[in-house]
Amino acid sequence: MTYLRITLAALAALALGAGFTPATGAAQQKLKVHISVDMEGVGGVVTGEQLGPSGFEYGRFREFMTREALAAIEAATRAGATEIIVADSHGNGQNLLIDQLPAEVRVIRSWPRRLGMVAGIDDTVDAAIFIGYHAGTNNPAGVRAHTFSSANLTRVALNGTDVTEGSWNAAIAGHFGVPVIMMSGDDAAIAEVRKAVGDLEAAETKRSLGFHSALTLTPQASATLIGNRVSAAMSRRSAFRPLKVQTPVTVDVSFKHYLPSEILAYLPLFERTDSHSVRFRAKDMVEASAIMSFIGDYRPDITP
């Protein structure tokens, strides 16, 4: 018993000397963080050459995207996060170099997902972070601005207000009572999300000069800024509030071509509001997200 007391005392002294605080008897408080990672808002991204497998810079920018995600993960962990879920939410959903992420992180990859870019979020999550986000499709100022699909959609509105991916995903998080505390992306994307959720912490990785041009930070500078802003957000986490929308929700979707709206209107769920647009109603954001996922992901030739 004497030996045990001496050993415990020695260990405590070593821990204090290393800067640790001894436990008070209670288990470490759980703190769960969800990080949704897109790519258009990553520092340096300006054209499709950085955004998909056919682009000559895609391989390098997967590294930069991963570096930005890792900066957010490490900062959240230092601030006390005990569980982190990362959703790879760009393109095919298989962009992050997951072997470079900490072993404790869990990663959501590929599609389809009922909750889209924030798949994995629920009421056990304490905070949401958006990395690499971009402006919405009708914003003339954003780099690579679009909403969900640059190829197919020209507008998405929630309860009569145009939404971006950032504000839509914030509303899904809000359904579960989860606040968005930090985001990164270009100046236009940040302004849009702040308009929806309030003055969250933000890392401006670049300033838009046009759809395909920007004044950008370097990858290292972007990652450093993201880490700093995540740290700041985590330190005042209690100051943020979840985005709540009125339910049931009404969603308007406009397509680049007329045929999708014509065919969707065959279903009683959808009302065709003009040649290129449909409207649907959902009981909440979870149901609305599932319907939007159907619109975006369904094809009759899907295999297997």
What are these model-predicted stretches?
Residues 172-180, 184-229:
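Active-site rim beta-loop-alpha module in soluble metabolic enzymes
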Residues 84, 222, 227-304:
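C-terminal accessory domains and tails appended to enzymatic cores
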Residues 150-176, 185-188:
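Active-site glycine-rich loop that binds ribose-phosphate moieties when present
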